[in-house]
Amino acid sequence: MEPTKKRIEVLDYLRGFALLGIIFANIVSIIHVTEHTGNVDIVYMKYLNILVEAKFFSIFSLLFGIGFYIFFHNAKQKDVNPYFLYLRRILILLLLGLIHQIFQPGEALFFYAIVGLPLLLFTFVDKRINLVLGLILLALGVLSGNKITFIPGLFILGYTIGQYDLHKTIYHHARALRISLLLSTIGFIISMVVLHLYYVAPSYDLVESTLSNETYVKMYETFSNLIVYTAPFISLFYVLLFVYLLKFDGAKKLLRPL
């Protein structure tokens, strides 16, 4: 298979994977679930928080940065003005984001447009500097405890992946991919252990009566922060595992769109 074709396939598969995860992440708010009473509800919410919340949002944000790189440089190769085309797209995204905010406040499209606009500035920056800036901004975003603040760092890191041509050459670095997957697996396992140890039920009514409300609030805040802190490690594991599995024809056939 040609590298360019494989690159497009990998990104398309990852986009579909990220969108599926985002649907799961938003399903509770979409169907307006306000109480979790049954055991099934509790287990579902537990693993929704541990395995899904903030993870697929992170993957999609990273893909936005990669997509920006591809769009920008394809436009330059076609000898058209990439800045004008991108600004037009961002304005459309901003409009859609504003409309989306009316029906589902707090969703990411509006923030994508706001953060995506200054992304043009990083097209003038060396890839090594972008890598450092992206990692710093992502770390600051994680420490803030709010997944929305992941966006700037992930956008820049996605663009940096494009600058390093990793979206084209990822399968040319088989050993590095295996080592990265191994390390990310360790990070994933540690994250799972930590999240299970600090897990708190989604409502005070569901915890032991011996636990005071004040203690519950503190424990829940800790668990909520840990969801955000561990999200980059879990997201990285998902991406690397998914990319690695796509090396095999059987996995590609299983995941291929209908």
Q: Model-derived features: where do they sit?
A:
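Alpha-helical transmembrane segments and their immediate juxtamembrane cytosolic regions
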Residues: 1-258
